Amino acid sequence: VAKKAAKKTAKKTAKKTAKKTAKKTAKKTAKKTAKKTAKKTASKTVKKKAGSIPSGDYDLVVVESPSKAKTIKKYLGKGYQVVASNGHIKDLPKSKLGVDVKENFEIDLVPITGKKDKIERIQELAKGANIIYLAPDMDREGEAIAHHIAEEIGKKKKIYRVVFNAVTKAAVNHAIENPVELNRHMYDSQKTRRVLDRLVGYKISPILWDKVQRGISAGRVQSVALRLTSEREDEIKAFVPEQWFSIHGEMNKDKTAFEFKYYGESASKKNDLTDEEETKKIVKDVKGKEYKIKEVKKRERKQNPTPPFTTSKLQQEAANKLGFTAKRTMMVAQKLYEGIQLRDHGMQGLITYMRTDSVRIAPESLSSLREFIQKKYGKDYLPSSPNEYKKKGSNKVQDAHEAIRPTSLTFTPDEVRGDLEPDQQKLYELIWNKFVSSQMGQAIIDQTSVTFENSGHFFKCSGSIIKFPGFRTVYLEAAAEKASKRGGNDDEDEIQASAKAGLLPELKEGESIKAFKEAKELEHWTSPPPRYNEASIVKEMEEQGIGRPSTYASIISNIQDRGYVEKIENRFVPTELGQVVCKMLVQSFPDVMNVKFTAGVEELLDKIEEGEIGWKKVLKDFWSKFEVTLEKAKEEMKNLKKQLIPTGINCKKCEDGEYHIKWGRNGQFLACSNYPDCNSTHDFKKDLEGTIHILPKNYFHDPCPTCGKRLEVKTGRYGRFVRCEDYPHCETTLPYTLPIVCPDCKIGKFAEKKSRYGKYFYGCTNYPECTNALWSRPYKNDCPSCGYAIMGYRETKREGKQLQCPKCKFKVDWEDTKFGKEEAAKQKSEEESVKESS
């Protein structure tokens, strides 16, 4: 009976428990389902707000830039949806090579971080579209973007490629009316370049981490550009100056002063003066005596205008005339190309596509320009037939692209003044003037050259006046402009003395004249080749065939960002790290570092684009040789981390040891030779002569919380940190923080950290209680849209420098913030001081 009763009780209890459990489970499930449903609904709502799917018939146009999309949308109007991809949407993965070198070079392309939503948005719009027009830029990168978008949309839709070299209503409509197929060969060319860059960078960089220091990198093109600056530095250091002399005097006739200069012992052969005694003897021979005029030569010289801008020439002239870096030039040009809001004309693209090596002008633009020149300057300034220019290295006058030019002669620099920012106005005027001058008539210059004789020694002087200015009325290239200001002759091979104002008085053969200021000798020393500046390094890369015009700005930025090159007095100087890495790469990878090899790759890429050679063959040929070189370098490249370089500088701490240069994980530093008995270390730098200067310690603004002594700012594998100066006696170590309180928890500050991939981020020190973190450096600047207390710094090729709210993504142009204004004022001051010194 007891057993039966217990059994019944157990059954009842089990039933009740099961019932309760089922109820609880049902409640939990219902709760979870409700949450999921709410999330989905919210997500859909957000998506609709972000960009609802339009109803009705429409065609879809995909471009790569939001500002370009905005301009084009206004041109096309109803019946079109325009969306931006914000640059590339797919690339090789960051976590692995992404290229199967064993299996026919299959490539693993993945969506770029943060682009998933953008891809989904394009796919959603594509579903309802009748026709899809892909309109990224007309270069290889633009073609790659178009192919990647087409792959994500799929083959079920009608997809066309549209290309235009100007963001104007006429150009865009013409492109839409005349669509073309996607260019597979051009895409193959871009893929080849990307894979070659990945193979070189991904395979060589780890060897440098092991042998030199972590975090540095090699690149197929950037390393060759580094070689240019490094070898120029070697030339400068090896240069031995040589003494030489010149003899100058001054004459004056009819109240016109002019300078004369020693030429030689005959009127036909120039004599270089290298002997001081010989020079002094000539000065003594002619002193107090008359100079007889032996010959007066007068000739009319014609000077031709130069072509409109290519990318490289624009970068060079903007550097020489405006003081712009290549990067700054391209950022400003990008905005002028994509569209500027004009008060009386709405959104307008003001210049044609700015990445080009063509000097061609479209026939309709050429016709408009000739009409403009005749109307504004008169028929004397217009040549009888258009000036024709050939692309460098080509016999063709015609090619598919155009030079950089204004899109419309309606928008004169004066017309758009007030609508453009200062940098935009300067660059637009430069492009405008160069374009107009390229189709103007020749300048005619009357030149006079006079030869004098005194005691068997010959002297010369020259003067010139502009008889007809022609194209010089509008534009003169930087080099010619400087020569013109000096009163000199910008295209004469011989450097001759000249009249200061360009004029000579009336001088006749057989006439004798005395010196107003007696001839005297001047001592000179030959100079080493100059270090590269922005203009000359772009010119050198173009002449050597290194990279493409569209890549020059990023190449120059890369070698600076990597710490291989620094800018001193507006010239590029390789750092110690840059010199070391360059020499090691040249020794271990002679083919990759060969300028001719890099130029040869560019030719192969052109052949792939023309369909003359298969892209996989190029990769196979490269890899078969490169793989062998890689294995050899792993074994034979020197390990700098194990080397000690004595400096001859006594240790400041123990005064007994000597500082040695050592290589650590973060570069070179000075360490006492008595280590471990003395742990004194210092950062240092070398000046241009190679002298070592010990840098003062960098102290943090707060004291050590443990012992009260100063905290030193140090650099480690994961970025900067602070450590007590009394280390190792006091082992206090803290993160490097910015003086900005976290707006989320209002307790922590933002600490600077570096990820395992070398990228910096800023996280709250109150972690894990507060997980606030930013990939961009925070600034204490209230967001104008949502009021959030900080904004993050960002810089992109298309939009330039900005502060962006991490919450609502609202953006403010950097130049409109107090930080940007302070930076601009500092930069302006530096540029003015450079101009004054030059």
Outline where the language-model segments fall:
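Basic, low-complexity terminal or inter-domain segments flanking catalytic cores
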Residues: 2, 22, 26, 30, ...
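Intrinsically disordered, low-complexity regulatory segments
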Residues: 2, 39-194, 203, 263-264, ...
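Conserved short loop/turn motifs at secondary-structure junctions
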Residues: 57, 137-138, 213-217, 298-307, ...
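Helical mechanochemical/support elements of P-loop NTPase systems and associated helical scaffolds
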Residues: 68, 72, 114-125, 138-149, ...
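Phosphate-backbone binding and catalysis cores of DNA-processing enzymes
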Residues: 74, 121-300, 405-467
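Core structural elements
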Residues: 193-203, 221, 251-253, 301-313, ...
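C-terminal accessory/connector segments of nucleic-acid motor ATPases
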Residues: 239-260, 291-332, 670-674, 722
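Short acidic, hydrophobic short linear motifs in intrinsically disordered regions
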Residues: 293-296, 305-318, 345-353, 528-540
